[in-house]
Curated annotation (Swiss-Prot):
This is Aspartyl/glutamyl-tRNA(Asn/Gln) amidotransferase subunit B. Pfam families: GatB_N (PF02934), GatB_Yqey (PF02637). The lineage of its organism: Bacteria, Bacillati, Mycoplasmatota, Mycoplasmoidales, Metamycoplasmataceae. Heterotrimer of A, B and C subunits. InterPro entries: Asn/Gln-tRNA_amidoTrfase_suB/E, Asn/Gln-tRNA_Trfase_suB/E_cat, Asn/Gln_amidotransferase, Asn/Gln_tRNA_amidoTrase-B-like, GatB, GatB_Yqey_C_2, Gln-tRNA_amidoTrfase_suB_CS, Gln_synth/guanido_kin_cat_dom. It comes from the Bacteria. Allows the formation of correctly charged Asn-tRNA(Asn) or Gln-tRNA(Gln) through the transamidation of misacylated Asp-tRNA(Asn) or Glu-tRNA(Gln) in organisms which lack either or both of asparaginyl-tRNA or glutaminyl-tRNA synthetases. The reaction takes place in the presence of glutamine and ATP through an activated phospho-Asp-tRNA(Asn) or phospho-Glu-tRNA(Gln). Its EC number is 6.3.5.-. Belongs to the GatB/GatE family. GatB subfamily. It catalyses: L-glutamyl-tRNA(Gln) + L-glutamine + ATP + H2O = L-glutaminyl-tRNA(Gln) + L-glutamate + ADP + phosphate + H(+); L-aspartyl-tRNA(Asn) + L-glutamine + ATP + H2O = L-asparaginyl-tRNA(Asn) + L-glutamate + ADP + phosphate + 2 H(+).
Length: 473
C-alpha cells in the first residue's frame, strides 16, 4: 500500500479598504451603478499615467510586518500581459520581480499540534473588471477594475484540507484585525486559489498540480481539496497522468469542474512598468506604519481574562464584535463577557442583527452593570434594562426609575411583606421546624412573585430566615 503526501500551496487575494483605486483617484463604491466608477486610467486610455495609492502601500507594509516578512524598501511595479475582456489595458500592473514583502510565516494550531506556514511573498496589484455571464453573452462592470489588491502566496507547505482551512481563516482574521480589508470570502473581498498535487510519501519531487480558483467559503475549500486528492489518487493507481488543469467548484453540485487544461506555460511577458518610477520607501516611512493588536495577541489577552472558550472564539471570529466588546470599560472582563453575551448578543440575535448594530452606547452597558453591582437593580431588571438602552443617550438612572426597575432593598418594607406572607400562609409555615428549606423557598418565591422580582435577594433571604425563626422561638 502506497502512502501519499498532499502538497498544497495557496494564493489569497485580499481587496484593500482604501477610498480610491490602486492607480487612479476614482472613488471605490460597491453600490454604484455599473461602469460609473471607472476613469481613463482604469480603462487603459492612451496617454494616461498611473499614480500609486499611498494608503495601499501602507496597508501592504502593515501586512508584511504582521507576517514577519522582509520589506523591500524600493517599491517597483511590473506589467503582466494577457488578453481578456476584464482587462482593458491588455496588461495588469503588479509586482512580479520585486514584491513588497518576502519570506514570512504564520504559526497555527491544528487540534493542539502547532505548525508554521511559510509565506513566499506578498505583492500589490490591481483588480480586474467584474464579469456577469448570461446564457448567450457576458456583461462587464469596470467599477472593480483598478481596486487595490494584495496577493499572498505561500510556499507549497500545507499538507491537508484542515491545514488549508486554518491558514485561510488565519489570514482572514489578520487582515480584519489590521482593518485593511473586509476579508470576507462570501463577498469576494478575500479570494482563495488552491494549488494541489500528491506524491508518494518521502518523495521530494513535485508532480503536475491542479489549481482550483476563487473558492468562496472554508466549506468549499475543504470539499474541493478532498475531492481533488481523491481524483489524483485514483489516477495514480490507474497509471493515468494528472493533467495540469484549472478548475472551479460548481456552486449547485459542489463538485469540481475543469475550466481549462494547461498544455504549456503561459508567457505573460513581464517587464518593469515604465510609467511608475522606482519609489524609495524610507526607513522613517516604513517605521511609521504601526501594527494593531494581532489575532494571537488578542487571543492571549482574552485568555488572561479567563473568558470561556465559546465567548473567546466568538470575539476572535468577528473583529467588529471584538472591538465593540473592548470599547466597554467595565473592568471585570469575565463578568462583562457573561452579561454581554447573555443580554446584548442575545438581544441582537433575536432581532437577526449584529450586537454592534444595536446602537447601544458601550458606556451605558458599563453603567448598567455598575447599577447591578451597587444592588440598585437586580439581574432580572438588568435583562429588562438592556433592550431599553437601544438608541438611548440620556440619564440611565432616570430610565431605571421611569420603568420601575429599581431593586427593593428597604429592610422594613421587605420585612412587612414577608410577615404578611407568613400570616396568610400559616398552615404551611407550621412545617418550618421540620422542613425549613421547603418553607423558606415558598416564602421567598411568594415574595418575588408579589414584588415582580424586584426584591434584593440577599436582603430578602436574611429577613425571611429571621422572621421565620422568630415565629418559632
Amino acid at each position: 500500500m502506497i502512502n501519499f503526501e498532499t502538497v498544497i500551496g495557496i494564493e489569497i487575494h485580499i481587496e484593500l479598504k482604501t477610498k480610491t483605486k490602486m492607480f487612479s483617484p476614482v472613488e471605490i463604491n460597491f453600490n454604484a451603478e455599473s461602469n460609473t466608477k471607472a476613469n481613463q486610467i482604469d480603462l487603459g486610455y492612451p496617454g494616461t499615467l498611473p499614480q500609486v495609492n499611498k494608503k495601499a502601500v501602507k496597508y501592504a507594509i502593515m501586512l508584511a510586518k504582521a507576517l514577519n516578512m522582509q520589506i523591500d524598501s524600493n517599491l517597483r511595479f511590473d506589467r503582466k500581459h494577457y488578453f481578456y475582456p476584464d482587462l482593458p489595458k491588455g496588461y495588469q500592473i503588479t509586482q512580479f520581480y520585486h514584491p513588497i514583502g518576502r519570506e514570512g510565516q504564520i504559526k497555527l494550531n491544528n487540534n493542539g499540534k502547532e505548525f508554521e506556514v511559510n509565506i513566499e511573498r506578498i505583492h500589490l496589484e490591481e483588480d480586474t473588471a467584474r464579469q456577469h455571464h448570461k446564457d448567450n453573452y457576458s456583461q462587464l462592470d469596470y467599477n472593480r477594475a483598478g481596486i487595490p489588491l494584495i496577493e499572498i502566496v505561500t510556499h507549497p507547505v500545507l499538507r491537508s484540507s484542515d491545514e488549508a482551512c486554518l491558514y485561510v481563516d488565519a489570514i482572514r482574521k489578520v487582515v480584519q484585525t489590521l482593518e485593511i480589508s473586509e476579508g470576507r470570502l462570501e463577498i469576494g473581498s478575500l479570494r482563495a486559489d488552491i494549488n494541489i498535487s500528491i506524491r508518494p510519501l518521502g518523495s521530494k519531487s513535485f508532480s503536475n498540480k491542479v489549481e482550483i480558483k476563487n473558492l468562496n467559503s472554508l466549506k468549499n475549500i475543504k470539499l474541493a481539496i478532498e475531492e481533488e486528492i481523491a481524483l489524483q489518487r485514483a489516477k495514480f493507481f490507474a497509471n493515468e497522468e494528472v493533467l495540469q488543469q484549472t478548475k472551479k467548484i460548481d456552486e449547485k453540485t459542489l463538485k469540481l469542474q475543469v475550466l481549462r487544461t494547461k498544455t504549456s506555460t503561459i508567457d505573460y511577458r513581464y517587464f518593469p512598468e515604465p510609467n511608475i518610477p522606482f519609489i524609495k520607501l524610507s526607513k522613517k516611512f516604513i517605521s511609521s506604519v504601526k501594527l494593531k493588536e494581532l489575532p494571537w495577541e488578542k487571543e492571549a489577552r482574552y485568555k488572561s481574562y479567563n473568558l470561556n472558550s465559546i465567548y473567546l472564539n466568538s470575539l476572535l471570529d468577528d473583529i467588529h464584535l471584538a472591538n465593540y466588546f473592548d470599547s466597554i470599560s467595565y473592568p471585570d472582563k469575565d463578568k462583562l463577557s457573561k452579561i454581554f453575551f447573555a443580554e446584548v448578543v442575545s438581544l441582537a440575535n433575536s432581532k437577526e442583527m449584529k450586537a454592534y448594530h444595536l446602537n447601544i452606547d458601550p458606556e451605558n452597558i458599563t453603567k448598567a452593570i455598575n447599577l447591578l453591582d451597587e444592588e440598585v437593580i437586580s439581574g432580572k431588571s438588568l435583562k429588562k434594562l438592556i433592550p431599553l438602552l437601544v438608541n438611548f443617550k440620556s440619564d440611565i438612572k432616570k430610565l431605571v426609575k421611569q420603568n420601575s426597575l429599581e431593586q427593593i432593598s428597604d429592610p422594613n418594607l421587605i420585612s412587612n411583606i414577608i410577615k404578611e406572607i407568613i400570616k396568610t400562609n400559616s398552615e404551611l409555615v407550621k412545617e418550618y421546624p421540620t422542613r425549613q428549606e421547603k418553607v423558606l423557598k415558598f416564602v421567598l418565591g411568594k415574595l418575588m412573585k408579589d414584588t415582580g422580582g424586584q426584591v434584593n435577594p440577599t436582603v430578602a433571604n436574611e429577613i425571611a430566615i429571621k422572621s421565620l425563626d422568630e415565629v418559632f422561638k
